[in-house]
């Protein structure tokens, strides 16, 4: 990298930062009509490496860039497994990955989707109402698991995965898009065997080339270009302790820090 690139934005990823990460998603300043999505901790002022970065034209807003980055996870996992997605779908968790998965499924044409969440915040209710109108969909919030054919697991929590295994019917599918980090797992392999369950991992890096991931990202940016996304993304200006303050309470699906450059 010949010329130093400043970092203009970083995105908060609660799933990783809860376990000690200081952030890893940065968006560079504009140079020669281009931006880069880079590996970057919060408060880093310059891009250290372009390894695993995505280059894209400066024609997309920050809300689109943020959603599209998280939407890589469901896209790269679900695209070649659509035969395993049944109409009875539940998404467990509505954080960064869960909400991105919801948007991706709606864009694929799935209309009836249940959402399992514990805390039904106003921003969640408002978003579901808006998306139901926009997509003519039937998105519903549930607080307990029942029987579905397709489970999108976006929490990474062992007890949720265990409950899915206990409730799932034969020949159904689970997509593990959340990252299990707890270290204690409660799944009985005999249940998987007896019910002939399909389980798919959803890690966005392993088994996928940089070219494939970059292509997915560009496709998503184009897909989302005309979407109204401002209500789903909070952008905060840089100030002391802003990251810690934002992490204290979740106020929207996506949270972004903007730096003075």
Residues covered by each model-derived region:
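Short, acidic/turn-prone active-site loops that include or flank metal/cofactor-
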Residues: 42-43, 59-61, 118-121, 178-182, ...
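Glycine-rich beta-strand-centered segment in the early N-terminal region that forms part
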Residues: 1-44
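Phosphate-binding loop/pocket of nucleotide- and phosphate-handling active sites
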Residues: 258-261
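Glycine- and other small-residue-rich loops at beta-strand/loop junctions that grip anionic moieties
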Residues: 90, 94, 116, 152-154, ...
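C-terminal substrate-binding/catalytic core of Rossmann-like NAD(P)-dependent dehydrogenases/reductases
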Residues: 185-233, 242
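Glycine-rich cofactor phosphate-binding loops and adjacent beta1-alpha1 units
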Residues: 125, 129-198
């Amino acid at each position: 990298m010949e010329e130093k690139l400043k970092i203009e934005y970083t995105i908060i990823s609660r799933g990783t930062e809860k376990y000690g990460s200081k952030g890893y998603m940065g968006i560079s300043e504009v140079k020669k009509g281009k931006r880069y999505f880079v590996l970057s901790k919060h408060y880093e002022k310059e891009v250290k490496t372009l390894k695993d970065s995505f280059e894209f034209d400066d024609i997309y807003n920050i809300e689109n860039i943020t959603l599209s980055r998280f939407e890589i996870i469901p896209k790269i996992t679900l695209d070649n497994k659509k035969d395993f997605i049944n109409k009875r779908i539940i998404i467990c968790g509505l954080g960064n990955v869960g909400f991105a998965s919801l948007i991706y499924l709606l864009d694929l044409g799935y209309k009836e989707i249940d959402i399992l969440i514990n805390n039904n915040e106003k921003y969640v209710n408002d978003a579901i109402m808006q998306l139901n109108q926009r997509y003519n969909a039937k998105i519903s919030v549930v607080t307990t698991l029942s029987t579905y054919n397709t489970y999108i697991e976006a929490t990474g929590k062992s007890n949720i995965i265990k409950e899915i295994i206990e409730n799932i019917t034969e020949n159904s599918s689970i997509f593990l898009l959340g990252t299990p980090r707890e270290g204690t797992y409660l799944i009985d392999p005999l249940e998987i065997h007896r019910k002939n369950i399909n389980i798919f991992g959803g890690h966005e890096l392993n088994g996928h080339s940089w070219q494939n991931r970059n292509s997915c990202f560009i496709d998503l940016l184009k897909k989302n270009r005309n979407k109204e996304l401002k209500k789903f993304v909070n952008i905060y200006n840089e100030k002391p302790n802003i990251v810690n303050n934002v992490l204290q309470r979740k106020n929207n699906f996506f949270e972004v820090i903007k730096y003075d450059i």
